[in-house]
Amino acid sequence: MKILYSQRRFYPVETLFNGTLALGGRDQETTGFAWWAGNARLINLSGKLLGAHVAHAGLIVFWAGAMNLFEVAHFVPEKPMYEQGLILLPHLATLGWGVGPGGEIVDTFPYFVSGVLHLISSAVLGFGGIYHALIGPETLEESFPFFGYVWKDKNKMTTILGIHLILLGAGAFLLVFKALYFGGIYDTWAPGGGDVRKITNLTLSPGVIFGYLLKSPFGGEGWIVSVDNLEDIIGGHVWLGSICIFGGIWHILTKPFAWARRALVWSGEAYLSYSLGAIAVFGFIACCFVWFNNTAYPSEFYGPTGPEASQAQAFTFLVRDQRLGANVGSAQGPTGLGKYIMRSPTGEIIFGGETMRFWDLRAPWLEPLRGPNGLDLSKLKKDIQPWQERRSAEYMTHAPLGSLNSVGGVATEINAVNYVSPRSWLATSHFVLGFFFFVGHLWHAGRARAAAAGFEKGIDRDFEPVLSMTPLN
């Protein structure tokens, strides 16, 4: 096997770990990687790499279960979910577990069950990881050819890709089945302020589903992030699941075409870079989804979006001043535009003031007050319901702003509470992690391409200053 990395040593490197960690075939001499390079030592040891991955899955699932139970233990049903620093329970509530009308949490037992199931699963994965890391065969090719592989084997690699795609498609269909048959999911748009319902009228029209992909990403359009009904979301998962499953079958049954064999780099590090690039894209999309979309991420659980909190403030003061006798249709603001409502350049009636930039917000508490041409002045005067006032006042004081020390909300707002929105956390974490994954993609892609081109030798050590120094010993 061609070693791609320089293994010359000019002076013996003595570390605490040198003697003890020279496990069979996993030391620096054999692999070109020191102990701290982690799984890089296992690139050609499929059995041990399996152990590392299964153990890692165990850690992930253990975190999910433990954090889930931690959130259940701290949960207070009387307070909104988004005021309690929760990031897992909102996802379970969105799936329709334990939720009643208006997003009220009526039963936390399903959340407890979820946590326990994840803990039990993590124990199984942890055992499997330790078994394969310490006891199982170093390589799988000889004993279990179905599970064995060589990174350069293009046909085997696309078969593995196909299996992964089928599993992803099955995951998409799990959401579809939950929404259609197993109790339904939470719909923030259900009449009267949100409820759990089964989705009966799926959107399967390719024109609608793929139309989202063709939309502009900018205001008023919003690409796929603009989806605002569960029918389209679940229909999209039917399409996505089907494409993944059929694509997976295709990749299992076929061999890569000549152009693909020539165009791609076929090595373990190249596959790592492709995966990191894909996950980075998913992270950036998830960031935009959780920040802007209040259908997939209902405001009842995640708190209002930024535009939603801003429009809620305009609405709250419109309600207050209208009660005090202001004529909200004609009152002028300091700029000469409408103080409470104004016309957009294209003629729709929108909220006035600073929130005009969020004119394209859609939210369940606001939509009933719209007419054919934006906000309806007569509805604003006669039809505002108490639940709309309550919800907008609540959202106004829970804007998704805040810092790490939890001094949340608008800094100058005297009614703000000490709070950081889960939207802030989830959007920021996915952006930051997406960025790190993107850097990892560039790093590993560069190394993989250099290795494939034959000039990856690590740092050139011929002229290192240390070579002219006296040996330490």
From Swiss-Prot:
Cofactor info, note text: Binds multiple chlorophylls and provides some of the ligands for the Ca-4Mn-5O cluster of the oxygen-evolving complex. It may also provide a ligand for a Cl- that is required for oxygen evolution. PSII binds additional chlorophylls, carotenoids and specific lipids.
Pfam families the record matches: PSII
Protein topology in the membrane:
Multi-pass membrane protein
Q: Which domain of life is it from?
A: Eukaryota
SUPFAM superfamilies listed in its UniProt record: Photosystem II antenna protein-like
What does the PTM comment of the record read? Phosphorylated on threonine residue(s).
InterPro entries membership:
PS_antenna-like (IPR000932), PS_II_antenna-like_sf (IPR036001), PSII_PsbC (IPR005869), PSII_PsbC_sf (IPR044900)
Set out the biological process GO terms recorded for this chain's protein. photosynthetic electron transport in photosystem II
Kindly give the NCBIfam families that the UniProt entry links to this protein.
Answer: psbC
State whether it acts alone or in a complex, and with which partners, per the record. Answer: PSII is composed of 1 copy each of membrane proteins PsbA, PsbB, PsbC, PsbD, PsbE, PsbF, PsbH, PsbI, PsbJ, PsbK, PsbL, PsbM, PsbT, PsbX, PsbY, PsbZ, Psb30/Ycf12, at least 3 peripheral proteins of the oxygen-evolving complex and a large number of cofactors. It forms dimeric complexes.
The pro-peptide lies at: 1-14
Which species is the source of this protein? Marchantia polymorpha
Q: Where are the transmembrane segments?
A: 69-93, 134-155, 178-200, 255-275, 291-312, 447-471
Residue positions, PTM Phosphothreonine: T15
Cellular location of this protein? Answer: Plastid, Chloroplast thylakoid membrane
* List of residues that carry N-acetylthreonine: T15
State the UniProt keywords alphabetically. Answer: Acetylation, Chlorophyll, Chloroplast, Chromophore, Manganese, Membrane, Metal-binding, Phosphoprotein, Photosynthesis, Photosystem II, Plastid, Thylakoid, Transmembrane, Transmembrane helix
Q: Which residues bind [CaMn4O5] cluster?
A: E367
Recorded GO MF terms: chlorophyll binding; electron transporter, transferring electrons within the cyclic electron transport pathway of photosynthesis activity; metal ion binding
Instruction: Give the function comment from the record.
Output: One of the components of the core complex of photosystem II (PSII). It binds chlorophyll and helps catalyze the primary light-induced photochemical processes of PSII. PSII is a light-driven water:plastoquinone oxidoreductase, using light energy to abstract electrons from H(2)O, generating O(2) and a proton gradient subsequently used for ATP formation.
Q: Provide the family line.
A: Belongs to the PsbB/PsbC family. PsbC subfamily.
For this record, an example GO cellular component is: chloroplast thylakoid membrane
Major subcellular location class: plastid
Classification via HAMAP family: PSII_PsbC_CP43
Name under which the protein is recorded: Photosystem II CP43 reaction center protein
User: Does the keyword field hold Transit peptide?
Assistant: no
